[in-house]
C-alpha cells in the first residue's frame, strides 16, 4: 500500500490557431516556438539589478526579425536575444518562482509561451538528468491530456528505496480574452492517482466558480476536467485564483487542495482614448525650436505591459500650414508637443489647430487601433513691436490760466495684441517743459496720448512751448528688439492771451489804528495790479462787503477813507479786527475782476464807562448776617478796565448813612448795612464805579436791594420775601382789574348755560321721544318687495287735467299703477276758514293743541299714498257724490283727539261767518 498520494494536473497547451482547430494534417518543416516548454534556472535568495538569469531560445522561422518578448512579472524582462534579467533588486520570498515568457511576432501576430522556473539554492536532479521542457506546437486536443508531475526524490533506507510524497506547484493557466468558443472550453484536467482505488469527486472554489462572477469556470466532478464557460474580458478581470478539491464519495478529503492561477491573456480590443477631445495650449511668438507647448494624453484599457496597451502619438495635420507645414512635433511616447521650426509670429498666425493621433500596438498603423484629438495652440503675444508715432510733429493751442485742458492728441501704431501690456502705450515728456505744466495721459480705448495742462500757463511769461515726447509700452521690449526712431515726436503748444482779472498784491492787507477816528480819515490805499501788460485797460474799485458800512473807497486809485466812526466794541468786530472786501474790475472784453480783503485792527481807547453788577440783590435786616458782593463790567480791554473803584455818593445822605462799601480787590467789593436794622423793603442804592483808563471814566449805577427778615441761616423767609417785594399801587390795580374780568367771564358763562338748559327743557316738553319723527323716514306703503315699475311720471298722477289721453284709450289690460278710467268721486268742499289775523293766535292755537296731546309731533308731516291698482273686492261702492248728507257726517272725528284735529276740520265743516 502506498504511503503517499498524488494529484495530477493535465494542462492544455495553447498553441497556434491550427492546434486550436484540431488541424494535424499540415506540419511545416520549420515550426515556430520556443526550444523548450519549461526553463529552469537556479538563483540566489537576493537577485541583483541587471543580473542575467537565463536565456530562452525562440525561432519564428523568419530570422526572429521584430520578435518581442514579454513576461507576466514587472521584476523581470527579456532582451531581444532572449536573455532574461532582473529589472531591479529582487528578494526571493519562496524557494521557487514560476514565470510565463511570451514571444510575439508583430508580422504574423503569433504568440508563443514558455514557463520559466527559478529555484533558490538547490540543484534539481531527476535520475541524474536535467528536466527537459516541452516544446510548444500544434497537438491534438485528444492528446492534450497528459500527466504533469514534478520530480520526486528517492532516499536510501534500510528497506531500500522509498518514494516520498511530492509538493505540487501548478504553473499559471493562460486563457485568451474574447475567445469565440465553442463553450464550455476545456482548460485542464485534475486527477488524483487514488482514482484507481476509490471513486473521487472533484470541485473548484473561488472567484469565478462559486463566488461572483459565478460559474465562469466549471469542473467535471468525475473526470476532473475544468472548463471555461464564456468569453473572458481582461479589462473586467485580469486573473482568477481558484482552489481544486478532491474528496471521496463520503465527502472526505482525499488530497490537499491545490491552487490554480488563471490569467486572462490580453487581446487588442480597446482603442486608445484621449482624456480630452480638445486640448488648449499656448506658446510665445518667436519661440525657438524645441520649446515645450503642451502634453496630450491617451489611455488604452488593454494591458500596458504588452503592445496592445502601448500607445504612440503622431501629428496628422496642422492648420494653417504657415510659415511651415511642420511647425510642431510630438513625442511619440509621452505626447509632449514642442516647436520644431522657427517663425511663430502672432501678427501673422494667431492660432494653430493640430490633429493628434494615438495608436496602440506601439504605433503600428497596420495592426493597431487609433483615435484622434484636437490640440489648439494659441500663439501668445510678446512685445516684439515697439509703438511708433503716426507723425513726427504735433501741435496744439491752449488759453492761459486754464487747467485740465487737452491740448493735443498723439496717435501711435502698435501691431502687438490690443489692450495688453505689450500694446498699452506710456507717454513721457523728455524735454521742453521744465516747470511741469503738461502731462500726457493714455486713452485706454484708443491708446492715444492726450497732452493735458496740469499747471496753468501765463501768456505774459511763455507764449509757446516746444515739447519732445517719447512713447513706450507697459511691458519691456522682447529680447533683441530695439526702440524705433519713430517712437519720438515733437509737440508745439501755442498759448493764447485772455483777459486776466486784476489782483491785489497784498491780499488780506492788515492795518492798525485807534478806534474812534473821525469820519473822512484816510486809512490806506488798497490798489490792484492788472496782469495783462499787453492790454490797455483801466481798473475800477468798489466795495463788495462792508458789514458796518464804515468805509469808502476811491473808484480810481483805491484810497480808503472812513464813512463813520470805527467802534471796537461793535458786534461787527471779531478779535479786535474789522474785515471789508473790495472789488477791482477792468474794462476788458469780457471784463474781469478780482477781490481783496482789508483787515483793520482797532486799538482800544477808554470810551466805555464800567457798569455795576449785579443789578439786583437781597440782604437781611440785620447787618451781621450777610453782605452783597458787587463787581463791574467794562466793554473796553486792558488797560482801560480794572482795577475799579466802588464808592457811595454823598447825596442823598441816607445812602452813606444806611450802607457801606468794603473793597475786596481791584475787581470786587462788598455792600453791607451800616445801621443795625433796616425795615424790610426794596431800596435803590446808587454806587459810583470808576475804571483805570486814561483818562478814567466813571458811572453811577443803581442796584435794587431787597431787605428781608432772615432765618438763623441767613436766608430770607417767605413772608419776608413777599413783604420785601413791595408791590406798587399800579401793580395792585392791575391785579384787581384782572380778577374782576375773570369773575365777569365766569358769570356770563353761567348765565349762558342756564338759558341753554331752559331752552332744551322747553323743547323736551313739546316732543315725545317715542313720537319724535324728525329726521326719520316713515314708510306706510311697504307691502312687500316694493314697486316693480319705478320709472313713471309723478306729475301726471298729481294733475288729473292732463289725463285726457288716458280717458280716450280703448278698454283692455292696464297696468296696476295706472289711474282708473272714469269719473272720480266728488267730495264736498269744506268752507274756507279765514286765516287768523294775528300770527301769534295761530301759534298759540298750535301750542294749546300740543299741550293737550304731549305725544303729538311738533309739526305736520305730509304722507303720500300711491295708487295701488283698480277694482275692489267689494261688490259695489257708492259714489261719494251720490251719498246722502247723513253719510257726510264726520263729527265723530272730533272725538279722536288733537292729533286728528286737521282731519276733522277738513271734513267736519265749520261755522259760517
Curated annotation (Swiss-Prot):
Question: How does the entry describe the domains?
Answer: Three calcium ions are usually bound at the interface of each cadherin domain and rigidify the connections, imparting a strong curvature to the full-length ectodomain.
Q: Which residues lie on this side of the membrane: Extracellular?
A: 167-731
- Annotated PANTHER family: CADHERIN-23, CADHERIN-4
Q: Which SUPFAM superfamilies match?
A: Cadherin-like
Briefly, what is this protein's role?
Cadherins are calcium-dependent cell adhesion proteins. They preferentially interact with themselves in a homophilic manner in connecting cells; cadherins may thus contribute to the sorting of heterogeneous cell types. May play an important role in retinal development.
Example GO BP = cell migration
Domain Cadherin, chain residue ranges per copy:
167-274, 275-389, 390-504, 505-610, 611-721
Q: Which residues form the propeptide?
A: 20-166
Leader sequence segment:
1-19
Gene Ontology CC annotations of this record: adherens junction; catenin complex
Q: Identify the Pfam families for this entry.
A: CADH_Y-type_LIR, Cadherin, Cadherin_pro
Q: According to the UniProt topology, which residue ranges lie Cytoplasmic? A: 754-913
Specify the protein's topology with respect to the membrane.
Answer: Single-pass type I membrane protein
Instruction: Write down what this protein is called.
Output: Cadherin-4
The residues that cross the membrane are 732-753
> Which species does the entry assign this protein to?
Gallus gallus (Chicken)
- State its location(s): Cell membrane
A GO molecular function held by the record: calcium ion binding
Please list the tissues where expression of this protein has been recorded: Embryonic brain and neuronal retina.
Chief localization class? membrane
The residues that the database entry marks as glycosylated are 280, 409, 554, 629, 658, 699
- SMART domains with a match to the protein in the record: CA, Cadherin_pro
Keywords of this protein's UniProt record, alphabetized?
A: Calcium, Cell adhesion, Cell membrane, Cleavage on pair of basic residues, Glycoprotein, Membrane, Metal-binding, Repeat, Signal, Transmembrane, Transmembrane helix
